[in-house]
């Protein structure tokens, strides 16, 4: 499935898996924030659905409240993150212990200081060595992985790359494939993500769905 419609990807995931979703996303900046926010909104509105997110380093720009700090920091933030950077709704709610009861967040790395006041994040923290993350995803019965990908137009057709987040995704893919266990990978094209070749390059058939829209930022 290839589409430019965000909502159709959300519908595709729930239609393919069901109402109870266990989802993984890369650590750091490999997350498709817009898709994750759309999934969050869907589950928040549908109390008979559940969403468990397994990831690490859910990053957001720092927030400032004082006028002097804002005047200093805002231009820097806009240069580094852009003026319309989509904040991860699940992590903003988790930090304040305001997650809906049908949504859980499990992280194995925290951004420094972000979980100090969150009982939910601390209680659902997973102490996992990076070497064992792929195995932990498999043992946790994760059903779908979502991540940003890069795209390159060539005379021979479109090429895709996992870019700076190939390692765990490829390991997880191999584990599920060897076990003949159902698993979905959703790629979201980001126009500014660097296209890395070698093992990071994959075919379109690596993904069950590809979202390619100019609205991704």
What are these regions (language model features)?
Residues 1-217:
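Conserved alpha/beta enzyme-core scaffold
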């Amino acid at each position: 499935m290839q589409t430019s419609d965000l909502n159709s990807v959300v519908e595709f995931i729930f239609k393919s898996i069901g109402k109870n979703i266990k989802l993984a996303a890369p650590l750091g900046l490999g997350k498709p924030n817009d898709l994750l926010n759309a999934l969050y909104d869907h589950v928040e509105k549908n109390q008979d659905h559940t969403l468990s997110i397994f990831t690490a380093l859910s990053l957001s720009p720092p927030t400032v409240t004082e006028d002097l700090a804002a005047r200093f920091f805002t231009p820097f933030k806009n240069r580094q993150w852009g003026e319309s950077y989509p904040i991860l709704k699940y992590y903003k709610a988790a930090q304040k212990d305001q997650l809906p009861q049908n949504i859980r967040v499990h992280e194995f790395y925290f951004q420094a200081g972000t979980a100090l006041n969150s009982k939910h994040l601390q209680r659902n923290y997973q102490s996992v060595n990076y070497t064992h993350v792929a195995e932990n995803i498999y043992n946790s019965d994760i059903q779908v992985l979502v991540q940003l990908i890069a795209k390159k137009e060539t005379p021979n057709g479109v090429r895709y790359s996992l870019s700076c987040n190939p390692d765990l995704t490829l390991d997880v893919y191999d584990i599920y494939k060897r076990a003949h266990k159902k698993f979905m990978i959703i790629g979201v094209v980001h126009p500014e993500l660097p296209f890395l070749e070698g093992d990071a390059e994959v075919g379109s058939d690596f993904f069950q769905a590809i979202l390619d829209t100019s609205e991704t930022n």
